Structure formats: C-alpha cells, structure tokens
Regions:
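Active-site neighborhoods and metal-handling regions in enzymes and metal-associated proteins
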Residues: 1-126
C-alpha cells in the first residue's frame, strides 16, 4: 500500500518490483543458488531500466535471527536446501520519485516453494 496519491512513475515502479519478485519466487526450489535467484529478479529490474536504483541483495535467510544465510545476492554461490526459509525482497529507490520494496517469506521445498507471507500485493493508496 501507499500513503497518499502517487505519481504514475511510482505506480510503474511498484509493478516492476512486484513482477521481479514474482519471477524470482517462481524460481525458488532446492538446488538453485542465491546468485541465480538474484540474477532473475535483478535482470528484470535492469531490463525495465531501473537497475541503477536497485542497490541491495534480493533477499536472505531467516531463522533465529532476521538476517541469516543463505544470502540471495550477486556473490552467494551456495545452493538452497529444502526446509530453509528465505526472503525475496527486490526494491527500487528513485530520488525525487520514491522507493518500493516488496518482501515475502518463502519456504524452500524440494520441488519449489511455499509463500509464508499472507498479505495483499494489490497496489492501494490510503
């Protein structure tokens, strides 16, 4: 959701981030590595022309601490294992326009994933 009315560009950014996240989540499964997951979402954002405004990793593991391994980023070569819980959280931050980050918690399974977060991803201005 957004507080207040947003520009058309901000709404476009929201849609790009959402689609990048969805494409990344669809690739989650045991045996994929953090670099590949990052490459999928980051590539989508870059292809949309906003690559220079995405300046963090795609996500990370969560467990006893909120930030744990595995990392979902450009340099993480380890492979996802079934049973791990990770975040997928792309974001775009454009000066003078605003920033969007959409984060969901995802369980890695042998053949795919299960989204653990239960929150609407519909764009809403409040």
């Amino acid at each position: 959701f957004s507080i207040g009315k947003q520009s058309d560009e901000a709404k476009k950014i929201y849609q790009i981030v959402l689609e990048a996240q969805q494409k990344t989540i669809e690739a989650v499964k045991e045996g994929v590595n953090g670099q590949e997951l990052d490459r999928i979402g980051r590539g989508y954002i870059e292809d949309a022309g906003y690559g220079k405004y995405f300046n963090h990793g795609m996500g990370h593991g969560i467990g006893l601490d909120i930030h744990e391994l595995p990392n979902i980023g450009r340099t993480y070569e380890e492979y996802m294992k079934a049973g791990q819980i990770i975040t997928i959280e792309p974001g775009i931050y454009v000066p003078g326009v605003g920033g969007v980050r959409i984060e969901d918690d995802v369980l890695v399974t042998k053949n795919g994933y299960e989204i653990l977060t239960d929150f609407s991803r519909d764009y809403t201005e409040v």
